[in-house]
């Protein structure tokens, strides 16, 4: 028996270059904006769709690991709403 994945994939690369000391309320505002952009980019009528978001933290800002985790958690929370 062969099971075929009929789900389409929408991939977005999001470049992140933020200051090391970005305030917490700005992170939530920023991730809300990203989540809105992701949902806007999904074509109407596509119900079987995997959304893959790749966030590139390779900028020169030297963002700390706990800040990266905070951004990822906040973005996940916004996307699940």
Swiss-Prot record:
Name listed for the protein in its UniProt record = Uncharacterized protein F58F12.2
User: Native species of this protein?
Assistant: Caenorhabditis elegans
